[in-house]
Amino acid sequence: MVKLRLKRCGRKQRAVYRIVAIDVRSRREGRDLRKVGFYDPIKNQTYLNVPAILYFLEKGAQPTGTVQDILKKAEVFKELGPNQTKFN
């Protein structure tokens, strides 16, 4: 099973996160399938590769809680079909 989750980057006390598609059994810093976004909580900046995110969501990937909140704020779920909005 694939999840969309955050992968920590940056230095000490200045964390930034990559949003990655990763296998459930991998650890947080493990090898990802694909990088699909970027999130900086300090500057409150977000970059999302929406076509890649939609591809993984259509294939059955489950976003974690934090990633789901980021995607809701960016209104990514509105681009999914009405039969695939099980994340709202």
From Swiss-Prot:
It is found in: Plastid, Chloroplast. GO terms for biological process: translation. SUPFAM superfamilies: Ribosomal protein S16 (SSF54565). The gene is rps16. Pfam families: Ribosomal_S16. This is Small ribosomal subunit protein bS16c. Disulfide bonds: none annotated. The lineage of its organism: Eukaryota, Viridiplantae, Streptophyta, Embryophyta, Tracheophyta. Keywords: Chloroplast, Plastid, Ribonucleoprotein, Ribosomal protein. Belongs to the bacterial ribosomal protein bS16 family. It comes from the Eukaryota. GO terms for molecular function: structural constituent of ribosome. It comes from Helianthus annuus.
